[in-house]
């Protein structure tokens, strides 16, 4: 009938990935070494509630520039509905996104000194980076999300979830 109603509602999306994976390896060359961890997930839908808030067009919140592409006149071709109070707050499949990703989770690069100093039997310097890069088509900050950073009971909902922190650690190991 051209009107959205409660009868049009259905379950959409599945937050469970088809599979998850990880790859770890270490490489050595002379006194240098590198440890590597890559993780990922294939499939699994994410409801991007952050986008929902930014594209709702129903209150006085700041809006994303995507709402400039909203439907305004008959004949417009767009996936952004017209701004009105009736349908702006309805959950829509346009906020469901593929949560697949590959993440460079951790890399450590180190050097073992062959001739430690007097009184030092072993000396190693290293740098480790974590959460270095994510390959994904997900439009949010990080596809590893759950609402309000809580339990898996709300898996697959991104409602202002902060991305995982990128960290760098510089270290020195010495045995005396």
Could you say what each language-model-derived stretch is?
Residues 1-6, 79-93, 147-154:
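Flexible, solvent-exposed coil segments and beta strand-coil junctions
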Residues 1-15, 130-132, 137-140:
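Conserved small-residue
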Residues 17-21, 100-105, 164-168:
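Residues that define the transmembrane beta-barrel architecture of outer-membrane proteins
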Residues 28, 39-41, 128-132, 175:
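Outer-membrane beta-barrel pore domains and translocons
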Residues 31-36, 116-117:
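Repeated loop/turn-to-beta-strand initiation elements of outer-membrane beta-barrel proteins
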Residues 36, 125-127, 172:
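Membrane-embedded beta-strand positions of outer-membrane beta-barrel proteins
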Residues 41-124, 128-130:
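Extracytoplasmic gating/loop element in the C-terminal half of outer-membrane beta-barrel translocons
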Residues 64, 75-76, 136-176:
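C-terminal beta-signal and terminal closure region of outer-membrane beta-barrel proteins
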